[in-house]
From Swiss-Prot:
It comes from the Eukaryota. Residues 304-387 form the TGS domain. The modification N6-acetyllysine is found at residue 294. The gene is OLA1. This is Obg-like ATPase 1. It comes from Homo sapiens. GO terms for molecular function: ATP binding; ATP hydrolysis activity; cadherin binding; GTP binding; metal ion binding; ribosomal large subunit binding. HAMAP family: YchF_OLA1_ATPase.
Amino acid sequence: MPPKKGGDGIKPPPIIGRFGTSLKIGIVGLPNVGKSTFFNVLTNSQASAENFPFCTIDPNESRVPVPDERFDFLCQYHKPASKIPAFLNVVDIAGLVKGAHNGQGLGNAFLSHISACDGIFHLTRAFEDDDITHVEGSVDPIRDIEIIHEELQLKDEEMIGPIIDKLEKVAVRGGDKKLKPEYDIMCKVKSWVIDQKKPVRFYHDWNDKEIEVLNKHLFLTSKPMVYLVNLSEKDYIRKKNKWLIKIKEWVDKYDPGALVIPFSGALELKLQELSAEERQKYLEANMTQSALPKIIKAGFAALQLEYFFTAGPDEVRAWTIRKGTKAPQAAGKIHTDFEKGFIMAEVMKYEDFKEEGSENAVKAAGKYRQQGRNYIVEDGDIIFFKFNTPQQPKKK
């Protein structure tokens, strides 16, 4: 397996992209690297996975529950009538080929499907199999990763020119002062993407005004990536593959801070065909485990999403929010009245609840907190909101 990521000193990227919690992550890669097989095992669905470059033409989309031991514990504790976990929306996108930005293969459709996603599972193949053709004729994951990066980069470069031309016509030659700041920002984007040949997300100092402009255009290279390396079952179990270190070195150099996660589509497929008991025996015998929980959590985090819990005998539920969400807006996820009439958030940390054993014990230990409207909700908070009910207009 690749060495553990250092990167403690890397500044986190700014949050660029659509604002909301119904965000999607797309599975992107060359044809026949295992995208549809991965999508099938991830979502337990049956998208066609034939050995054919364009067997996924329309993107298949599915919701995948986010595995979480905290959620499972709360469900075991409360034994609620209703259990609702957080979900990750995953899209399987047609295989890209070299020249996609010029419409090669299913290039334009492929790139528009990526544009509709908010993050990317960049899947690359590091297994040999004579029965599964490779569109480039040989297995070389570094080359494949570079092809994808180049296509996304070239598509962004192609988009930037017309945007600047239009703004120049109105803001510079037409003298529209309101649009001049946007023109200046797009010139900065052009310098970074076209002149310096760097993806949008690699610049970590975009300010709020610049991000506002970037969000109007949703450039492909602004989307966060998680790199998934598809290994043979044998290589995954023995934790060895000649490409892994090279891939990790490439990512650390060209996409610092991004995660590289090895997995085996063949193993995951086999595990799904076994009964729960057989699966457990097989994993123990081979001293291995499924990579899917780690992959799902990494995709969710890459979209800058997290969740808080509401928990009781009626329902245990994970409510998805963007990182940095304040208490009133988090309350609004449950009901708009909660946000409008927000009084306070009564907050327990999951760790405190588990350690103390009950809500009353958390209160007795002085760990039950009352938070106001400036409180930034943290991942895994257990919250009870207090709010004023809006007055109904009197009937005449």
